[in-house]
């Protein structure tokens, strides 16, 4: 293994928004590791890694073991052996590890290899990356069983805890982040790499705050979490150093969550507040804004203008200027706008510039809502910082901006404080007892290294530490009664910043949830840009839905049935006993009476709630669609036929009992909440009881709407699981006409809403989107439209091939013909192809048929199977120029693979919504032309999104293959083809398409 000569910066490997002092801390670790002495953690260490035939602990076996003895950072001895697993090594494993059957043919058996390893290790401390995996495979047979007695340190735990702001904690990424030897994913190479980063990880732990290290060291005994020994030894070292420096013995470092959080906001780390003349205030939001002139916007997009000066390779784009001026016009005239701007227009800067200038000049605020986190991060961490810098240099003003997501994206300090008090416990995950200690440690370290960033990038296993135990909801939040309210609180501290920001960036979910919460979640904002707007209708419908979630019902039921104070607020309240019986006998008697009454109501509710949620699953038998029989999860339209069924009648009866219990619970708990008002020392538990009231009331209202009423404004659906042991049922009431709701809740409260996307129109027609979003129905909802083509030459760079001789999807021989075509197409193009399926079963059947032929030709094909990491597939696809991918919905949009990585996209079947989809069924009953009014336009938009995966830069080129014959045989085929970004469309046979792919010349005529 060779050292990488190229210097890499830690900055490139940390998550966006990481505080500068934390980046500096990370950057110093390599130097610290060179000179430090870590005592027993640095002596008699054996670093180990294994390779196996797979990840199944029961079925798979070892193929290689590598270990190196490490003394103060120096490798003194090696142990490396192949292992004969007694079974063939799967091809995908061989590709990953570069270990083949021929390598292991004459190697020792697993027992023999582990015996040799045990002799090599002796009594040394073992270090491994994801140690539980390696420990299992080397100790599961008699040869290595004795190694269970050794101390095992998990370097992955160390990395996640000490370096929580890194984007990834994979060994290869740690190697790159700290400029260590490059791993080749063989066990011996990985061991050498881990040897190089091990002391850096120890340095990272040593650099953590002393009190936090000490707290982590006491989270769990060594038997439950052996890696905790590292924190115990380093805590002892830190105490010794503190003793030496102070001259007095340091017994311990008491941990304070509040003090740790305050430390993050010391004066040195405080961001500059928005200047007084530009900071929005409550009154300014209702006043007209002052916007720049159109000429000023046009000048800004010239090569020497505000935007042009931001980029070294800036090229003026007419479409970008037109869009910016249209956004300006919409804002300055208080009208709404719908704009489709093709790929390459630069639409985000086209709306950010007029937004920023208007907000700065008016002391007001403009909001931006995105569908994906990728675009949100691009705006907040790339484009707005650039814009802020250039506006400041030009003397325009100090632009302030804040990104804000929902409550569930941020840790709740109050709940985290409960976790700190309770400590770690063992929990069962898929049959194994696992300690919560490493998850709690990583969470606390992340909080210490974070100002207000969300925890979406934090690598926590929420089966071990449930997300609801870390985050709060708008209902649960104590607000001003919380001891952490103010700057220490992630949500309210960030919201306070948002109130004084010129630009507020959020996601579609919170944007529409704020409507449902009547403006409680976001600061008042009268001007909005909704980007990626093609997904806005569906997100609005999800946000405004009324739900009965079985998992939430069961969770509340279990809380109220629990006998421990940690989970049951009534038990906790009774044990806290705020009333002194001796001095306040009457009040004390009333308190205990009300508490017992509420607790009794809670126990009764628990039984009825569990029964009700359990019987939701009875509705599975109402699904008469044969095609759904092999699916684990189904979605059922609750129509009149279902409502008159025996199963629904039974469920309604259980629902009636549930409602009666819920009403009694609400009444008893409400009395208790009222009694506790003004009582000292019970604010947190009072809020917990109030949350029970709010949750139960919400369930009551949902139950009444879904079970007892049929409101024509809603479509009713049931999401069901066929697995008896799985609690995943959810009854929903979804608004049919979301546009009418938006007309009443959004447009009346805003001056202007701009909807933008690369895919909104069907052909050149915005009618479907306007209707879906309720635009143009009233004076407040009036809207203009703007269609802008791509700044890229799609006609030149994208060739569209429409197959004419493939059977239609419902005809005999379709799948076999498709499989043969896909095999030939991949061979002709030499890989680099993305095939986008609408059906998992068809995708997996095609993969099984196509993959063997491609393997013989030396081409890799991967498939988005159950349990496969989407991120892993994306990363793998981008790294391997010839890799091809079979994928589902998550790859139809938001997946960028510029350059030669992606040369072809195949769409085997048009993405029409399932005819059994509850919304489609309801629309079909109400509208005889529902398919053409709703299903067809949505499918067109999805195809446009998929086509956009192919051309992501000026120099990209490739071929889009539409393998659905209905584009030729059905009248609606013209609607799809007219809507594509490229007009270079050729109808051809499969053989002609294969020849075109083989030539690989985009735009060449088919002979």
Q: Which residues does each predicted region cover?
A:
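Acidic, Mg2+-coordinating catalytic module of metal-dependent nucleases/exonucleases
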Residues: 122-142, 161-237, 962
């Amino acid at each position: 293994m060779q050292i990488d000569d190229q210097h890499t910066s830690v900055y490139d490997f940390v998550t966006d928004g990481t505080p500068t002092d934390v980046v500096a801390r990370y950057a110093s670790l390599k130097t610290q590791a060179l000179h430090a002495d870590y005592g027993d953690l640095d002596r008699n260490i054996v670093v180990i890694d294994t390779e196996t035939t797979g990840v199944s602990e029961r079925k798979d076996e070892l193929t290689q073991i590598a270990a190196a003895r490490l003394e103060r950072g120096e490798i003194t001895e090696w142990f490396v052996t192949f292992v004969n697993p007694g079974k063939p090594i799967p091809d995908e494993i061989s590709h990953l590890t570069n270990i083949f059957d021929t390598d292991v043919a004459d190697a020792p058996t697993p027992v023999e290899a582990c015996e040799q390893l045990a002799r090599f290790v002796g009594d040394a401390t073992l270090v491994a990356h994801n140690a539980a995996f390696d420990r299992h495979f080397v100790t599961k047979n008699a040869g290595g069983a004795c190694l269970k007695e050794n101390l095992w340190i998990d370097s992955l735990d160390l990395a996640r805890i000490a370096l929580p702001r890194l984007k990834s904690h994979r060994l290869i990424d740690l190697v790159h982040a700290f400029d260590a030897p490059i791993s080749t994913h063989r066990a011996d190479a990985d061991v050498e790499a881990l040897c190089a980063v091990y002391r850096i990880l120890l340095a990272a732990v040593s650099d953590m705050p002393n009190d936090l290290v000490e707290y982590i060291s006491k989270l769990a005994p060594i038997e439950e979490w052996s890696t905790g020994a590292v924190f115990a030894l380093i805590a002892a070292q830190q105490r010794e150093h503190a003793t030496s420096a102070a001259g007095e013995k340091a017994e311990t470092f008491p941990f304070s969550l509040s003090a740790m959080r305050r430390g993050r906001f010391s004066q040195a780390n405080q961001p500059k507040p928005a200047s007084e003349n530009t900071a929005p205030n409550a009154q300014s939001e209702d006043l007209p804004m002052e916007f720049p002139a159109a000429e000023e916007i046009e000048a800004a997009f010239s090569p020497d203008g505000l935007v042009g000066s931001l980029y070294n390779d800036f090229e003026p784009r007419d479409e970008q200027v037109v869009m910016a001026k249209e956004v300006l016009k919409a804002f300055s005239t208080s009208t709404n706008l719908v704009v489709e701007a093709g790929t390459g227009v630069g639409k985000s800067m086209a709306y950010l510039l007029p937004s920023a200038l208007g907000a700065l000049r008016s002391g007001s605020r403009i909001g931006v809502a995105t569908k994906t986190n990728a675009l949100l991060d691009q705006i907040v961490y790339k484009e707005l910082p650039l814009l802020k810098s250039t506006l400041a240099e030009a003397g325009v003003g100090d632009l302030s901006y804040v990104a804000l997501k929902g409550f569930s994206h941020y840790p709740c300090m109050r709940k985290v404080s409960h976790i700190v008090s309770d400590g770690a416990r063992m929990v069962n995950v898929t049959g194994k007892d696992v300690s919560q200690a490493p998850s709690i440690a990583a969470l606390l370290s992340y909080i210490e290294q974070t100002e207000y960033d969300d925890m979406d990038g934090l690598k926590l296993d929420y089966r071990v530490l449930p997300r609801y135990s870390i985050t709060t909801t708008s209902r649960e939040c104590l607000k001003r009664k919380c001891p952490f309210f103010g700057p220490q609180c992630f949500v309210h501290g960030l919201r306070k910043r948002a109130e004084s920001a010129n630009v507020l960036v959020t996601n579609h979910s919170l944007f529409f949830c704020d409507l449902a919460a009547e403006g409680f979640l976001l600061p008042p904002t009268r001007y909005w840009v909704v980007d990626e707007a093609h997904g806005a209708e569906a997100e609005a419908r999800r946000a405004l839905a009324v739900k009965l979630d079985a998992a939430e019902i069961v969770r509340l039921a279990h809380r109220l049935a629990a006998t421990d104070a940690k989970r049951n607020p009534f038990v906790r309240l009774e044990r806290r006993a705020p009333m002194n019986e001796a001095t306040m006998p009457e009040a004390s008697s009333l308190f205990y009476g009300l508490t017992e009454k509420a607790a009794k109501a809670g126990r009764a509710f628990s039984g009825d709630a569990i029964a009700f949620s359990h019987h939701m699953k009875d509705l599975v038998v109402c699904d008469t669609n044969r095609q759904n029989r092999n699916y684990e999860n189904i979605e059922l339209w609750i129509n009149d036929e279902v409502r008159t069924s025996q199963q629904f009648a039974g469920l309604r009866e259980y629902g009636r009992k549930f409602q009666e219990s819920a009403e009694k619970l609400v009444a008893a708990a409400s009395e208790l909440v009222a009694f506790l008002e003004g009582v000292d020392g019970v604010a947190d538990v009072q809020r917990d009881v109030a949350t029970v009231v709010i949750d139960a009331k919400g369930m009551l209202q949902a139950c009444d709407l879904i079970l007892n009423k049929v409101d024509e404004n809603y479509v009713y659906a049931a999401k069901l699981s066929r697995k008896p042991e799985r609690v995943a049922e959810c009854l929903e009431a979804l608004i049919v006409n979301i546009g009418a709701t938006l007309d009443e809740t959004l447009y009346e409260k805003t001056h202007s809403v701009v909807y933008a996307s690369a895919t909104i129109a069907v052909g050149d027609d915005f009618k479907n989107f306007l209707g879906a979003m309720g635009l143009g129905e009233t004076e407040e909802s009036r809207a203009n439209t703007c269609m802008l083509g791509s700044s890229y030459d799609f006609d030149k760079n994208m060739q569209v091939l429409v197959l004419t001789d493939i059977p239609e999807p419902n005809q005999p021989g379709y799948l076999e013909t498709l499989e043969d075509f896909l095999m030939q197409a991949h061979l002709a193009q030499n890989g680099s192809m993305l095939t986008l399926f609408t059906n998992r079963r068809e995708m997996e059947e095609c993969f099984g048929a196509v993959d063997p032929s491609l393997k013989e030709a030396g081409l890799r094909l991967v498939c988005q199977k159950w349990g496969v990491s989407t991120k892993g597939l994306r990363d793998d696809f981008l790294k391997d120029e010839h890799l091809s991918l079979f994928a589902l919905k998550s790859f139809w949009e938001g997946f960028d693979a510029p350059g030669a990585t992606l040369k072809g996209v195949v769409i085997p079947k048009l993405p029409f919504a399932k005819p059994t989809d509850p919304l489609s069924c309801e629309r079909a009953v109400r509208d005889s032309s529902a398919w053409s009014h709703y299903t067809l336009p949505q499918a067109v938009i999805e195809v446009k999104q998929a086509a956009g995966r192919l051309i992501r830069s000026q120099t990209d080129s490739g071929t889009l293959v539409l393998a659905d014959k209905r584009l030729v045989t059905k009248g609606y085929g013209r609607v799809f083809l007219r809507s594509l970004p490229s007009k270079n469309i050729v109808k051809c046979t499969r053989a002609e398409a294969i020849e075109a792919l083989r030539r690989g010349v985009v735009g060449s005529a088919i002979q």
